[in-house]
Amino acid sequence: MFRAALWPPVLLLLQLLLLACAPGGEGAHDQDEIRFLPGLAKQPSFRQYSGYLKGSGSKRLHYWFVESQKDPKSSPVVLWLNGGPGCSSLDGLLTEHGPFLIQPDGVTLEYNPYSWNLIANVLYLESPAGVGFSYSDDKSYATNDTEVAQSNFEALKDFFCLFPEYKGNELFLTGESYAGIYIPTLAVLVMQDPSMNLQGLAVGNGLSSYEQNDNSLVYFAYYHGLLGNRLWSSLQTHCCSQNQCNFHDNKEPECVANLQEVSHIVASSGLNIYNLYAPCAGGVPSHVRHEKDTVVVQDLGNIFTRLPLKRVWHQTLLRSGEKVHLDPPCTNTTAASNYLNDPHVRKALHIPEQLPRWDLCNFLVNIQYRRLYQSMCSQYLKLLSAQKYRILLYNGDVDMACNFMGDEWFVDSLNQKMEVQRRPWLVDYGESGEQIAGFVKEFSHIAFLTIKGAGHMVPTDKPQAALTMFSRFLNRQPY
């Protein structure tokens, strides 16, 4: 009798679970298949799809899924997220490690010999809603770390409803920059869902800890010759005590003034914050510029966030009522923007006609975003406690937005058992032989790795090294 009383609710639960994936089944995604992609001299031999996944509430997140060129059925599924917050993951596809890269003419796509879909099925997701082609029916784009993690989780579940043939494949979560927050917060949700075959996560030049990022950046800037002895001496005097320096949230007025100067040198002087040794696209920028009726700003708000003038400046812009466009510093987004706003391309990608133009980053999403976490320590410790996930934090070593030293300090602070001492890792460059590609140290279930000479966008700067690293990560090989 007791069992009989429970049986109808169990049936109802099963029905609800089935209804959640009701549109699924192999072939349900056929309407999203990209049949012809403009810009290619020859259409690809692998399948690719573009459409929408259901996020939380009325959010619809745009995805572009490229199947593996190796063997889709046995290759892992890899989620990729770019950061911002408020910037599009299509930047990763079209300028970093996608199967084809946009050319300067904004029309032509060229095949990428170091594409990550050579060995994996890669899902590029534009997140959160309001970014790129993603939208929300209620047009509410103010969000936070927790909401974004949940919405990305819902979208990932919807992906496996749409592509049930991939449910059993190994799943890896990867991303870059502010995805240093997105990926571990999402992974903590995914690890609790036994229907997903989560195997690991990798974050490139990620924001793992605001404090360690700020503190390390000042050392990075000084020892790369950017600050000079006068400023360095003043920083040591006013920001440090007993061999401990606080460059993150120091309230001492002279220290704050010094850090304003450091922030200007690193982010606003004309140096390329994403690659110290690369030129600044468009030349030395002004802090704010105008394009017709639009104010163009370039600060994504991830370094020295506690400086008071930064907060005042951001709120003034938000209240101004002016039309504001967010354009990351020293980057040229014209080619990708021209391509993705071409009507033929939008039609090929199944983008609704009523959606606004695609931009790399969305100012409103960025400026209204609530940063709930100052560090990802608890998330990584939770993932590491499972003792079954392969985790990689990798950094191009000439990036200043999320510098290698801060992420190395962060990994060290997790206090995991050291398995391989810091050593060079090698890439075979054919005729020039094996070369040192960077340095790696490995702990139990987590590794930290640098890519020599790469900036914030590692696959753009060092594509062969990036693919080699990615392959070793997926295949659980020594780096």
Swiss-Prot record:
Instruction: Identify the main location.
Output: other
Q: Report a single Gene Ontology molecular function.
A: serine-type carboxypeptidase activity
Q: Which GO terms describe its biological process?
A: proteolysis
Any idea where this protein resides?
Lysosome
Quickly give the catalysed reaction.
Release of a C-terminal amino acid with broad specificity
Q: Where is the signal peptide?
A: 1-27
Alphabetical list of Pfam families matching this protein: Peptidase_S10 (PF00450)
Give the glycosylated residues. N144, N332
Record's superkingdom?
Eukaryota
Q: Which family does it belong to?
A: Belongs to the peptidase S10 family.
Self-association state and partner proteins as the record states: Heterodimer of a 32 kDa chain and a 20 kDa chain; disulfide-linked.
Quote the protein name from its UniProt record. Answer: Lysosomal protective protein
Which organism encodes this protein?
Answer: Bos taurus (Bovine)
Q: What is the lineage of its organism?
A: Eukaryota, Metazoa, Chordata, Craniata, Vertebrata
